[in-house]
Amino acid sequence: MRAALQNSSVIGPTVGFVRLPHAEGLPLPAYESTGAAGMDLRAAVPDDRPLLILPGKRSLVPTGLILEIPEGMEGQVRPRSGLAFKHGLTVLNSPGTVDSDYRGEVKVLLINLGDEDFAVTRGMRIAQIVFAVVTQAAVEERSLAGGTARGSGGFGSTGTV
């Protein structure tokens, strides 16, 4: 297993991670390569009770982590490409948003789109989290929307495939 990179070389805001009792012994999220955008989230399920997700079914998987995300940022929970490609397992509400003021346990909503049962085991890397800057927009009601060359065309109207 490749050792995760130390975060000491990362320049950016600090995100606090609180490890809950059922996540004891699991590694904290870390960047796995110098160019990685996301940190892997692991399943904090009991060793003796893997979580079985049947084809077409979904399950909320605990990570055993509470995050302290700086104001003005969010955590985006995204699928891991290998799980999606090899097993059809993906994050149902992708990207799932973890707001900066949320202080509950981060859980990952997984769905099995594959043809076989999938067992989520303790410590399995089930998703990734990407931290991003967000802004809050001011709301201004208008009677008409300003015109553009595109207009109201959508769903393939730009001619790109």
UniProtKB/Swiss-Prot annotation:
GO molecular-function terms, A-Z: dUTP diphosphatase activity; magnesium ion binding
Superkingdom field: Bacteria
SUPFAM superfamilies membership: dUTPase-like (SSF51283)
Entry EC number(s): 3.6.1.23
The keyword Transmembrane is annotated on this UniProt entry: no
UniProt KW keywords: Hydrolase, Magnesium, Metal-binding, Nucleotide metabolism
Catalytic activity: dUTP + H2O = dUMP + diphosphate + H(+)
PANTHER family in the record: DEOXYURIDINE 5'-TRIPHOSPHATE NUCLEOTIDOHYDROLASE
Job description of the protein: This enzyme is involved in nucleotide metabolism: it produces dUMP, the immediate precursor of thymidine nucleotides and it decreases the intracellular concentration of dUTP so that uracil cannot be incorporated into DNA.
Protein name stated in the entry: Deoxyuridine 5'-triphosphate nucleotidohydrolase
Organism: Mesorhizobium japonicum (strain LMG 29417 / CECT 9101 / MAFF 303099) (Mesorhizobium loti (strain MAFF 303099))
Lineage: Bacteria, Pseudomonadati, Pseudomonadota, Alphaproteobacteria, Hyphomicrobiales
Gene name of the record: dut
